[in-house]
């Protein structure tokens, strides 16, 4: 994805820009505001025009942006607010859309539409990451890696990808900014988010978590399954044993949970290939109850 024409200059470029404009060195720690063109570009991407333009800048400013000088205003407060209001408006939407659905499936459906991966997808699909103000040295590379991996999972990876948290944060902070600017109007927030997140994950497109699907598959085929993650701290690897035999393995250094999910997916793919099977039936109530007791955090 190419940077849009109004993307903000990097933090390292800003002192030289100041010098060009003012014929003198920028004061230590100087951070120029976003220009009107940048703000307008963000508003265009969001489909919302702010009354208080300063909220746009606040929503896009990462804590690293002021390093090594004293901290300024960052997106953290707006992120907190946006997280809460997104949970509320999406909860309302799935509740009204699926009138007969029980709390368990409703919770999974809501989570799929507001989790870190879904919101990170929103950020990169609309190019919001180009306007992020930060000085985190490895962040741009992490975002690029995430974008390259997205093509493997058109809708959602269900726990197989590890998106940079800042992408999720910036969507939440912008939603929080819209909520504030609209005088706390949840309907406006929903209208904006619905367009940004299109297509929303529906009951028909809601995927299964690889660990839950693995346990369901093994129960149906009368196999014993064990996920071995005790050695992750030493070798960054998680293994899946089926009837005592190692069937799936995955290594991921950053998070044990991702290694666990990828190992479960590898084991599941191998089992299905062995049986010539591509899909499983919907999760039974008995298996669903057992799955709810499984630790999916990788701890």
UniProtKB/Swiss-Prot annotation:
**Which principal EC class is assigned to this enzyme?**
hydrolase
Q: Per its UniProt record, what Pfam families does this chain match? A: dsrm, Ribonuclease_3
Ranges for domain DRBM: 209-273
Q: Which EC number applies?
A: 3.1.26.-
**Which part of the chain is the RNase III domain?**
39-183
Tell me the GO BP annotations in alphabetical order. Answer: siRNA processing
Annotated Gene Ontology cellular components are: cytoplasm; nucleus
Q: Name one GO molecular function term.
A: metal ion binding
Stretches the record annotates as Disordered = 274-299
- Asked if the record carries the keyword Electron transport, the reply is no
UniProt xrefs under InterPro entries? dsRBD_dom (IPR014720), RNase_III_dom (IPR000999), RNase_III_sf (IPR036389)
Site (Important for activity) residue list: 165
Q: Where is the composition biased (Polar residues)?
A: 275-291
The record's annotation in Gene3D superfamilies points to: 3.30.160.20, Ribonuclease III domain
The alphabetical list of record keywords is: Endonuclease, Hydrolase, Magnesium, Manganese, Metal-binding, Nuclease, RNA-binding
Q: What cofactor is this protein dependent on?
A: Mg(2+); Mn(2+)
> From which domain of life does this come?
Eukaryota
What CDD domains does the database record attribute to this sequence? DSRM_EIF2AK2-like, RIBOc
Give the binding site residues for Mg(2+).
79, 169, 172
**What is the role of the protein in this entry?**
Cleaves double-stranded RNA (dsRNA).
The record's annotation in PANTHER family points to: DICER-RELATED, RNASE II-LIKE 1
The protein in question is named Ribonuclease 3-like protein 3
Question: What is the organism field in this record?
Answer: Oryza sativa subsp. japonica
């Amino acid at each position: 994805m190419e940077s849009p024409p109004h993307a903000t200059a990097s933090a390292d470029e800003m002192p030289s820009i100041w010098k060009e404009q003012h014929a003198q060195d920028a004061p230590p720690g100087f951070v120029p505001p976003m220009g009107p063109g940048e703000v307008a570009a963000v508003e265009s991407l969001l489909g919302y025009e702010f009354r208080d333009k300063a909220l746009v800048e606040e929503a896009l400013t990462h804590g690293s942006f002021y390093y090594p000088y004293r901290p300024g205003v960052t997106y953290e407060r707006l992120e907190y607010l946006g997280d809460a209001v997104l949970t509320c408006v999406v909860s309302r939407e799935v509740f009204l859309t699926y009138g007969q659905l029980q709390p368990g499936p409703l919770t999974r459906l809501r989570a799929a539409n507001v989790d870190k991966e879904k919101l990170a997808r929103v950020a990169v699909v609309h190019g919001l990451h180009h306007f992020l103000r930060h000085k985190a040295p490895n962040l741009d590379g992490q975002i690029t890696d995430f974008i390259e991996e997205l093509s493997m999972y058109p809708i959602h990876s269900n726990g197989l990808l590890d998106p940079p948290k800042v992408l999720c944060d910036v969507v939440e902070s912008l939603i929080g900014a819209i909520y504030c600017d609209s005088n706390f109007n949840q309907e406006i927030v929903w209208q904006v988010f619905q367009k940004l997140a299109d297509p929303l994950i529906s009951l028909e497109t809601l995927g299964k978590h690889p660990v839950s699907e693995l346990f369901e598959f093994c129960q149906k085929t009368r196999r014993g399954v064990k996920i071995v993650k005790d050695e992750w701290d030493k070798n960054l690897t998680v293994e899946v044993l089926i009837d005592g035999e190692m069937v799936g393995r995955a290594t991921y250094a950053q998070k044990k949970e991702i290694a666990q999910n990828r190992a479960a997916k590898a084991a599941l793919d191998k089992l299905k290939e062995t049986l010539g099977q591509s899909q499983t039936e919907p999760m039974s109530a008995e298996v669903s109850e057992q799955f709810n007791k499984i630790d999916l955090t990788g701890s």
